[in-house]
Amino acid sequence: MAEKEVKLMKGNEVIAHAAIRYGCDGYFGYPITPQSEVMETLMELKPWETTGMVVLQAESEISSINMVYGGASTGKRVMTSSSSPGISLMSEGLSYLAGAELPCLVINCQRGGPGLGTIQPSQGDYFQACKGGGHGDFHMIVLAPNSVQEMHDHVAEAFDLAFKYRNPAMILADGAIGQMMEKVVLAPQRPRKTDEEIAAECRSWATYGKPADRKRNIVTSLELQSEKMEIINKRLQEKYKALEENEVRYEEIGCDDADYVIVAFGSSARICSATVEMARAEGLKVGLLRPITLYPFPKKPLAELAARGVKGFLSAELNAGQMVEDVRLAVNGAAPVEHYGRQGGMLFAPDEVLVALKEKLINKK
């Protein structure tokens, strides 16, 4: 395999290539539009013949997430992918993974909902991804790519963060990013971790086989004594606090002198970057803040912009208004925060967002 390759491919396809190149040990999934190309590409590439990576189509999303649980318990780099309703079926398993502090990677290529909805792109799963993803007090690490290149790069970053914090990580994409084709630079092949490396790095928790010099590692999220369960929950919250302090990622475009700031992620942010250019051409000082990590969310940068004197924020999302709640919490009343969105698989255009910005903030009396 070449050390470095530049190819034209879909976002979903590049997930498969990145998984192999970044040393993934196993993929367990079930097909659902608009992300089915992830597993299809893996099947075509046959990594079991080159790197030894396991690729398996489970009988359901529920089975696939529980296979991920089993693989993650052994310290292996394992992953799955699905789209909105499929992720809902995985939610119990995601909670179990978080409760047992198991690292893994989940791809959600969002589609319009609720219910079966449509196969067109949406960002309606923000609450589901960022406010837990299942029952109980837990968080997933959530990365939001806005390009095919970032789909590729986030695979490595998500795995690294998942293992650093022993926590499930999600790449929250959408049908637009998953299906669009762009030039992408593929990473050099990383070798998969050896059993000896896994034993050294995951010795304290993974069930890779018990050596004589340590106690048994037991993987579970069960604790029937309330006092102990509270201690476990508090420890998890400390981990999330560390994530919020150390792992926030975001991008600012034209925010240095901005009077108004658009907040958008994923494919919406790509559209809104054109909105910023249009606004600047009209003499309007408009900037864009793009959260790259949706959890942990960039609260501090937003608060700093508000404290600096930004006159208003527009949260532009492909939903009825979800991330806007986190923007309002971050701004904390220092400036008006409004929402503009499209739903049901509809995308907004750059000029639509500019019109909304003017109506809701700039020209509002």
Predicted regions and their residues:
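N-terminal glycine-rich anion-binding loops that anchor highly charged ligand groups
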Residues: 7-44
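Structural signature of the thiamine diphosphate
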Residues: 140-197, 352-365
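Conformationally flexible catalytic loops at phosphate/diphosphate-handling active centers
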Residues: 166-252
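Redox- and metal-dependent alpha/beta enzyme cores, enriched for Fe-S-associated oxidoreductases
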Residues: 250-284, 289, 295-301
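Peripheral docking tails and interdomain loops at the edges
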Residues: 317-365
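Thiamine diphosphate
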Residues: 37-131, 141-163
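Glycine-/acidic-rich phosphate or pyrophosphate-binding loops and their flanking alpha/beta elements
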Residues: 8-14, 237-260, 273
